[in-house]
């Protein structure tokens, strides 16, 4: 198997929806096929690269633009870019899609908010409820349901593992092809 074109795959969903977990599982699938890939995890990239630690609306737009710039640089290499971040508005996602054109796929990790709140591995929802943080998607910031995702993964309902569904999508779109 080989990659036929540059592609970035953007995972979106609530905090604790399973974006990073699925991104890692998908990367392992690509590794098995010897297809080079890299993950941009929202939390890690913010800590490593961005000065801006704020999560207000203006900062989130600035963050989306920064991810876009990084994506354009990384896409010059022939690899799969996997981006795990919530980009919670359709405006943010449309901006990225418009700029990356046919090098963009959107995967919506559709996990109910109540499930995300129960998982809460980073204690974000708990901190929000106690008034310790604000600007939380699923708290005081609304997550806008994507209107044009390439794939919707319902973590509680799907029988096929998400990473297999994504791989199937890439094969169907001939982004990954047999090397015969």
Regions found by a protein language model. Name each.
Residues 32, 39, 104-108, 150-152:
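Conserved beta-strand scaffold positions in the cores of enzyme catalytic domains, especially
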Residues 19:
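Conserved lysine of the Walker
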Residues 48, 58-106, 125-128, 135-136:
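Glycine-rich phosphate-binding loop used to anchor ATP phosphates in small-molecule kinases
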Residues 1-8:
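Extreme N-terminal, non-catalytic leader segments
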Residues 23-72:
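Conserved substrate/cofactor phosphate-moiety recognition/catalytic segment
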Residues 15:
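The conserved Walker
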Residues 11:
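Hydrophobic anchor at the beta1->P-loop junction of P-loop NTPases
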Residues 110-113, 118-165, 172-180:
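Small-molecule kinase domains that catalyze NTP-dependent phosphoryl transfer to phosphate-bearing small molecules
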């Amino acid at each position: 198997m080989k990659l036929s074109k540059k592609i970035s795959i953007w995972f979106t969903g609530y905090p604790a929806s399973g974006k990073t977990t699925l991104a890692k599982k998908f990367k392992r699938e690509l590794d098995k096929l010897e297809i080079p890939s890299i993950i941009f995890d929202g939390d890690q990239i913010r800590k490593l690269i961005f000065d801006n630690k704020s999560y207000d609306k203006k900062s989130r737009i600035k963050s989306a633009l920064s991810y876009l710039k990084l994506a354009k640089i990384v896409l010059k290499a022939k690899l799969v870019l996997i981006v795990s971040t919530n980009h919670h508005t359709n405006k943010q996602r449309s901006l990225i899609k418009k700029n990356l054109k046919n090098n963009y796929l959107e995967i919506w990790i559709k996990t109910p908010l109540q499930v995300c709140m129960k998982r809460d591995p980073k204690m974000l929802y708990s901190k929000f409820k106690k008034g310790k943080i604000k600007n939380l998607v699923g708290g005081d910031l609304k997550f806008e349901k994507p209107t044009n995702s390439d794939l919707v993964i319902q973590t509680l309902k799907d029988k096929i593992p998400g990473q297999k569904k994504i791989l199937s999508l890439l094969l169907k779109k001939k982004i990954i092809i047999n090397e015969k």
